[in-house]
A protein has these predicted regions:
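Extracytosolic ligand-binding ectodomains
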Residues: 1-226
Length: 226
C-alpha cells in the first residue's frame, strides 16, 4: 500500500489504543516526511492532539537532544517514523534511558525482530502497523523463507522478493535484460492468464516461459498489476 494508506492505518490503530496526544519524529528523508504528514493529518482527524513534529537524522551516536525536544512537547506516546537499525532505534533507546516515553507508535520501517530482541519487554506498550498479505502466497513464502534460514517477518521482505522475481520473469519473457523490454513484459507475467507461480517456483516459471507458455505470478503478496 501507499504511504497515504499506511499512515491512515497507523492513525486508526493509534485511535484504537486510546492515545489522546502524540509527539511525532521522522527520519529526515522523503519517506519519513511523507508518512509523517499523512499520519499527522489522520490522527488529528481522529481528535488526537499532535504535540510536535520533528525530524531526526540517521547515523548519530546519541539522540538525547532530539528526545529532550519531544519530551518538552509531551504526549501519551511518541510516533517513531524511521528505520529500526538507524535513528528510530536511537530515539527509542534515548527515550527509555531518560524515561521520557514508554509507549512508541512504530511505522513499517521500525518493525522487525531485531527491535524486540534489543528492547524486549520495554516495548510491551508499543504498537505499529506493517503491510502484508494473508493469501496463499504469504504462507508459502514464510515456509520457503524459513527453510532457507531467512526471516520473512521484516518490513517489505515479501515485496522485495516479488520485485526481484518479477524482473527475472520479465527478462525471460522478453528474452532481454533491456529496461524497456522488462517494463513491456512485467505486466504480462504478473497477471492472468497463465499458470500461477508461487514463492519457490521461480524455476517452474522460467521453464514455462522458455516453452512459450504464459505465467501468472502470484508470489508472496498476491501480485496483480493494472
Amino acid at each position: 500500500p501507499s504511504d497515504a494508506r499506511g499512515g491512515q492505518i497507523l492513525a486508526d490503530v493509534t485511535k484504537d489504543r486510546k492515545i489522546k496526544s502524540v509527539a511525532i519524529t521522522y527520519t529526515n528523508n522523503d519517506y519519513g516526511k511523507g508518512l509523517a504528514d499523512v499520519y499527522k493529518a489522520a490522527v488529528e482527524a481522529h481528535g488526537i492532539k499532535v504535540t510536535t513534529v520533528t525530524a531526526h537524522e540517521d547515523g548519530k551516536a546519541d539522540y538525547s537532544s532530539e528526545v529532550a525536544t519531544l519530551a518538552s512537547a509531551g504526549g501519551d506516546a511518541v510516533a517513531v517514523i524511521g528505520y529500526l537499525d538507524q535513528g528510530g532505534k536511537g530515539i527509542i533507546q534515548a527515550s527509555l534511558d531518560s524515561g521520557a516515553f514508554d509507549t512508541f507508535v512504530l511505522s513499517d520501517g521500525m518493525i522487525g525482530d531485531s527491535l524486540t530482541d534489543t528492547f524486549g519487554k520495554d516495548l510491551d506498550k508499543s504498537f505499529g502497523s506493517l503491510p502484508g498479505s494473508t493469501g496463499k502466497g504469504a504462507g508459502v513464502f514464510k515456509s520457503v523463507a524459513e527453510a532457507a534460514g531467512i526471516d520473512s517477518s521484516g518490513p517489505y521482505t515479501g515485496e522485495s522478493y516479488d520485485a526481484a522475481a518479477l524482473i527475472i520473469l520479465a527478462m525471460q519473457a522478453g528474452g532481454s535484460a533491456d529496461r524497456t523490454s522488462i517494463s513491456q513484459n512485467i505486466i504480462d507475467v504478473a497477471n492472468s492468464p497463465g499458470t500461477k507461480i508461487y514463492p519457490g517456483e521461480l524455476k517452474k516459471g522460467l521453464d514455462l516461459l522458455a516453452k512459450g507458455k504464459k505465467v501468472d505470478y502470484e508470489g508472496a503478496t498476491g501480485v496483480t498489476f493494472t
